[in-house]
Amino acid sequence: MGKEQELVQAVKAEDVGTAQRLLQRPRPGKAKLLGSTKKINVNFQDPDGFSALHHAALNGNTELISLLLEAQAAVDIKDNKGMRPLHYAAWQGRKEPMKLVLKAGSAVNIPSDEGHIPLHLAAQHGHYDVSEMLLQHQSNPCMVDNSGKTPLDLACEFGRVGVVQLLLSSNMCAALLEPRPGDATDPNGTSPLHLAAKNGHIDIIRLLLQAGIDINRQTKSGTALHEAALCGKTEVVRLLLDSGINAHVRNTYSQTALDIVHQFTTSQASREIKQLLREASAALQVRATKDYCNNYDLTSLNVKAGDIITVLEQHPDGRWKGCIHDNRTGNDRVGYFPSSLGEAIVKRAGSRAGTEPSLPQGSSSSGPSAPPEEIWVLRKPFAGGDRSGSISGMAGGRGSGGHALHAGSEGVKLLATVLSQKSVSESGPGDSPAKPPEGSAGVARSQPPVAHAGQVYGEQPPKKLEPASEGKSSEAVSQWLTAFQLQLYAPNFISAGYDLPTISRMTPEDLTAIGVTKPGHRKKIAAEISGLSIPDWLPEHKPANLAVWLSMIGLAQYYKVLVDNGYENIDFITDITWEDLQEIGITKLGHQKKLMLAVRKLAELQKAEYAKYEGGPLRRKAPQSLEVMAIESPPPPEPTPADCQSPKMTTFQDSELSDELQAAMTGPAEVGPTTEKPSSHLPPTPRATTRQDSSLGGRARHMSSSQELLGDGPPGPSSPMSRSQEYLLDEGPAPGTPPREARPGRHGHSIKRASVPPVPGKPRQVLPPGTSHFTPPQTPTKTRPGSPQALGGPHGPAPATAKVKPTPQLLPPTERPMSPRSLPQSPTHRGFAYVLPQPVEGEVGPAAPGPAPPPVPTAVPTLCLPPEADAEPGRPKKRAHSLNRYAASDSEPERDELLVPAAAGPYATVQRRVGRSHSVRAPAGADKNVNRSQSFAVRPRKKGPPPPPPKRSSSALASANLADEPVPDAEPEDGLLGVRAQCRRASDLAGSVDTGSAGSVKSIAAMLELSSIGGGGRAARRPPEGHPTPRPASPEPGRVATVLASVKHKEAIGPGGEVVNRRRTLSGPVTGLLATARRGPGESADPGPFVEDGTGRQRPRGPSKGEAGVEGPPLAKVEASATLKRRIRAKQNQQENVKFILTESDTVKRRPKAKEREAGPEPPPPLSVYHNGTGTVRRRPASEQAGPPELPPPPPPAEPPPTDLAHLPPLPPPEGEARKPAKPPVSPKPVLTQPVPKLQGSPTPTSKKVPLPGPGSPEVKRAHGTPPPVSPKPPPPPTAPKPVKAVAGLPSGSAGPSPAPSPARQPPAALAKPPGTPPSLGASPAKPPSPGAPALHVPAKPPRAAAAAAAAAAAPPAPPEGASPGDSARQKLEETSACLAAALQAVEEKIRQEDAQGPRDSAAEKSTGSILDDIGSMFDDLADQLDAMLE
């Protein structure tokens, strides 16, 4: 180690002495003598780039730092990350090392590779002194690192309060708090407030708000309220709402904070947050007084008496748009309901800051053209600052100053409209536009939400003009509080300026604002307030001047303040707002409240003067606790001249409406009072002109798309339209107009829409059948207001609310999914439904002529009945991401479990699965226009023919029919897959996958992998001879058999649905390949039983290497997936009419037993490829028994070389024999020291035995003529060949000498094909080179053996025949197989005798079957042991 390295090590170890010794200069004389004048390199850097000074700074050792700096160490040397000693000193956070390094001249603003300057590190770690020192050395706190964060951002993110205070007190504070350009679109854009809110640092949020940060500052994810709500920070949400954040702001995904909480959080905290946000954004809550259901209107809200409806906005025709939240399911239903339906029960989120907005109170004079209809009005309280803002910030709806009050909610705009709709006929000649309509500048009363729901606005209690004196009022407050033992709060009330009359209008939030913070106390006081019966104390007449008015309300002390600030005129005072009171110094909450109540009263009096000539009685709201009032219009008087001016209109906060809004609301009146047009939904009434002509009009441009109204009436002539209204206001029927393209809807709340048909009486556009529908690009274009709306209707549900894409394409009427919320949701489905509608491809059938769907706002997803025209019964459209089908895990319910009606169709809205795997159903036929989405489509199971699959050109062909049934070619055009009408359900096939349905390759793969883990299909049982396979008469065949086996569990689902804790593999009846080889090219292949029975998950193999490419009949075309290379080529020349009679057995899947061994050769099923894990093993299904009866028993075992089997003599089938399902008898046991356990008969036609040489392992015993099922090519060392087949589990008697040391070697011996072997190499040496060569078969294994071998596949690489997993494994297996040997020997002997006797009787067959069943059970246990050992 050189001196430099020694120095670095010494400094690292803080060895000052060694460092000094290394750094001291050698004496000149000594240096000359030694010839070493070379000085040590003090800047030497180790492999990480650390110099000695880096280590010293990081350790904070001032002595070493001084020593190194004296030795001329470079002070700004960088390590591999660009960090300098100053960075490490700042990170470490000690003042003295920092001073030394700064004194040495280190630069404070040079960033590291990550963009950090030392101030970033000091701020992030909360080192106050170091941060202060860096600021004093002119460190720039506005520098951002690579992730766009300033030191203030980091301090806020990590909760470093002291550093935040320090940075905010610096002269760069304003620059630090300014929003950076591009924050709203930059995915990394953030702000100190967002970071503090996200991490729940309340103290820092307070500091930031005090420093003047914009509370409504937005990034891509929304405001700080979005961040706090998403992260479940309840206290932060409360603080932000109290501080006046706008709860209606939408992020770039068009979500409010409440939307985010509804979608993404389920914790207890989120419930509180939901309530807080609901209160902050609630427009009005109404309790329904009666049931309401209009099944003919898609947009109506079905209401039951007692439902609490949150009112969102008003439709131009007078109906209210409301939302009912279902606390049980967490869903919202949104729709329209008549305004007369209920009574208002506003649980008002009152002024937490002690202030409330001056919301308009409607008067009785809302216009001659309006019918006497109740309009329930919300008066939204103010909670300080920008507490509740309209979604789009109404122009002119804000007060002055940094804390300008937004229009309270959506209800604000609708009320501003309703209450300000005055036609010219309403206005007298003396009206001045400078005076607001009565009530629009008033103050919302603040009663708590209790009793007196029935009182209406018109009841007038007696009044007392003079308020009590200050002393008396204080005493009265104390006595009142003492009465219910809460006198400790008397100072709070008195210091805030509250007297009893003002207390009678307090809300719980007002109580919080004055310091009543305990919920129990607050509730008690609120209850007592509701019991106060204080007569109305506000002046009944408009006094002559301001002084008189102030003395009448007991606030004469503010006369000078008001006059000094320009409110000397009594008429000016009606324009005052909460912000103005704060600004001019009226800060006592009680006085503010009293003053604003009196201002509202004064505005009402002024409005009453305007309305005198109308003759309508002035109704005034009595002091009750509930916000209940009905705005009733008097009968219309004689129309007044059209040139009368309308009074000036204001919003809820008493600020004037914008010019456009004024114009929009008063403009239609110029047309004259006689232009009346009946409303679409109501009989013609005199109100039509104002209610419709002065429809939302100009205010629409200030409305975001979440508030789209279903405008049915004609818009005002000069009303500028916002996008939302252009789509939502249509001008009556226009039968010839083609439907315009639907624009992408912005999805608002996650809601559940009641499914109701359209309103009959409404003039709707009829879509002619030939109307052009949307075409694939479907570029949403901005449409004109006049064109009819083809958005959703009886033939197409509106799209579900997808929160993922800001502007998903709307589906055409026939293709739109139903709302995800409409499906009963299992626990695995309960996540948010992500639906990403893609552009529709292909043709869309013309909609049935009839009333066009009413315009549906995209914030109101609807469920509609399926179109009858474009979907055949039982062919529900399915969506699939890649047109595959996955195995459903056992936790994912099928359609029956979802209880979705079979007619729920074209398809139910798909949901992003919460379960372990996506269960993707293959799309139904003709799905050129399927909207792909990452989804799982629920499939109705019990109706109609199966869904035709998609056309895929590359699919391998397989037959889905039994040999004795003709191939139905009725649906060739439906895709590659003519699914049979008698396909089984999953419960019938017990977890088998329907190869006759599209995408089954994926399912096969999933199933095969399941078999290696413990899932799997159930065995097949044979019915009595001659009976075709019983199939459940499922009227809905397309719903066949997803794999019910759990991906991770060991249980398989039995036929009855019970969990069978036994492994089952995919073996099933297998047929002889010999017949295949002997068949001529002209004979067509018959489907193997695997296809229909569902137990064989493999695709039939295509033509093998040496075979003629002769195709069979039209086979069920299995849809290939690009993701699976596990395609099985069909054996081309398979025979046709072989009957495979399959049943399901609980223990072993065995080959069909033939009554006569002499039966002709049987056609083999398609070659099976078993995929377990990565190893791919192609297994040839064992022969049913192919071979003439005359064949002698096999000779003693010889050991021929492992050659290709082409040289074996072909055995022609006897021509005259009928082809019956032959039972392959168990072949005679070879002469061996230890017999091989055999399960079922093996092909015995050939006398030649071909041993299978395994690389590095003894040859495995092989059946006579059985081809080596594995390519003899040794597996590549890195890949573990998956042993799929244990010889112990070979269902055929294997004979052949084996050098295996003991039978224990044989059971685990696996005929595994290495993963590297391409599919075409299936069993390459065993493959007959030509159709004439006899193909020999590896018999299928019993399920347990397969499972065991599959489980063994997880073991480390082993030779294909399955090297023993260990001595213990061998020992166990020896014991077990020894036990089985004798039984097997007896069975083989008996079978050999029976074979010689010719046809066996059924009794013999049964006895043999039961014996084999028992042996199968033993093998199950053996497989269990092997499995346990291998795992």
From Swiss-Prot:
Q: Say yes or no: keyword Cytoplasm present.
A: yes
The organism's taxonomic lineage, starting at the top: Eukaryota, Metazoa, Chordata, Craniata, Vertebrata
UniProt gene name: CASKIN1
Q: Which Pfam families match?
A: Ank_2, Ank_4, Caskin-Pro-rich, Caskin-tail, Caskin1-CID, SAM_1, SH3_2
Q: Where is this region: Disordered?
A: 348-373, 387-406, 421-447, 630-977, 1014-1039, 1072-1377, 1390-1416
Renumbered to this chain, the Basic and acidic residues biased-composition regions fall at 1390-1404
Task: Provide the protein name.
Answer: Caskin-1
Gene3D superfamilies xrefs: Ankyrin repeat-containing domain, SH3 Domains, Transcription Factor, Ets-1
Instruction: List the residue ranges of the region (CASK-binding).
Output: 375-469
Q: Which InterPro entries match?
A: ANKS1/Caskin, Ankyrin_rpt, Ankyrin_rpt-contain_sf, Caskin1-CID, Caskin1/2_SAM_1, Caskin1/2_SAM_2, Caskin1_SH3, Caskin_C
Give a GO cellular-component term.
cytoplasm
Where does the UniProt annotation locate this protein?
Cytoplasm
Which CDD domains has this protein been placed in?
Answer: SAM_caskin1_2_repeat1 (cd09497), SAM_caskin1_2_repeat2 (cd09498), SH3_Caskin1 (cd12062)
Q: Which UniProt keywords apply?
A: ANK repeat, Cytoplasm, Methylation, Phosphoprotein, Repeat, SH3 domain
As for what it does, the entry says: May link the scaffolding protein CASK to downstream intracellular effectors.
Q: Which SMART domains does the UniProt entry name for this protein?
A: ANK (SM00248), SAM (SM00454), SH3 (SM00326)
Instruction: Name the Gene Ontology molecular function terms of this record.
Output: identical protein binding
The chain's coiled-coil residues are none
Phosphothreonine occurs at which residues? 737, 1065, 1266
Ranges of compositional bias, category Polar residues: 772-786
Which residues are reported to carry the modification Phosphotyrosine?
A: 253
Domain SAM: from-to ranges? 472-535, 541-605
**One Gene Ontology term from the biological process aspect of the record:** regulation of postsynaptic density assembly
Q: How does it assemble?
A: Binds the CaM kinase domain of CASK. Forms a ternary complex with CASK and LIN7A, LIN7B or LIN7C. Competes with APBA1 that forms a similar complex with CASK and LIN7 proteins. The tripartite complex CASKIN1/CASK/LIN7(A/B/C) binds the cytoplasmic tail of NRXN1. Polymerizes, via the tandem SAM domains, to form long, 8 nM wide fibers, upon which other proteins can assemble.
> Is Repeat one of the keywords UniProt gives this record?
yes
Q: Which residues carry this modification: Omega-N-methylarginine?
A: 398
Specify the species: Homo sapiens
Question: Main localization of the protein?
Answer: cytoplasm
Give the Low complexity compositional bias ranges: 357-368, 798-808, 952-963, 1282-1297, 1343-1355
